[in-house]
Amino acid sequence: MKFRKTRIDDIQDVIEIINGAKNYFKEEDIDQWQKGYPNEKTIIKDIEEQRGYVLEKEEKVIATVALTFGGDPVYDTIYHGEWLSEEEYAVIRRVAVSGEYKRKGVSTKLISNIEKICIENNITNIKIVTHKKNIPMQNMLKKNNFKYCGIIYLEDGSERLAFEKII
């Protein structure tokens, strides 16, 4: 498998994977990614800002993720817990895996590659949030040694479970 930056010619593959995740969330009654986000505009911005990544298998895009540095004001206030560290951190966003590759260790492969990028950028803290009903994501995070830290609220007021890992 090859982990690399997302390119413009990947947009349709990435959108297809994200739409698959949106459909899964809808079927499972998970109110995440149900209001038009993320969309093509989001992916283009990720590409332009060099924060979008894909995982390929045999030249086919099978997963997508975004990684941002420099913090996020939404993460400043955490409820019913606390972050593991106050150090500078990276945020993992928009993790999605093609349906045919779910439960095959692909998300773990994404995480290990993200950790390498963080280390290269002298960042040892990684944060991520997910919906309370997104049990597969919570399980993947725990499997990859992320610790549950508490609850944050997105700009639209949506509640998310917050996780952090120190690498």
Positions of the model-derived regions?
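Conserved GNAT-fold acetyl-CoA-binding loop/helix
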Residues: K22-T42
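Conserved GNAT acetyl-CoA-binding A-motif
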Residues: I111, C118-T130
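Conserved acetyl-CoA-binding loop-helix of GNAT-fold acetyltransferases
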Residues: R94-V97, R103-K116, N139-K143
